[in-house]
Amino acid sequence: MKVKSGIYQQIYEVVRLIPEGRITTYGTIGRIVGCSARQVGYAMASSPPKQGIPWQRVVNRQGCISLRSHGSPDPRQRILLEEEGIDFDHKGRIDLNRFLWQEVE
């Protein structure tokens, strides 16, 4: 369990770096910390609610909000992103060219 906890903490540290009004993908976070996009998704689903982790800023590689276990996107995520000034197109996608956060090298 310690390994999982350690990688989750690394994921949370990177997610905290994403500035307001920007998003990134599960895969990008995974490449930064050395894990799979799926593991990043698990970490986001497990993130402690009161630790200031901006989980809403992580989306899938198409720029869409990923489906949750119940088969629908979390409507709170879209609301939070729109409050940060992020726009969605008519298909529910975010323009990655406009809003994608590029990690600092």
Question: Residues of each region from the PLM?
Answer:
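Nucleic acid-binding interface residues in structured DNA/RNA-binding domains
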Residues: 1-105
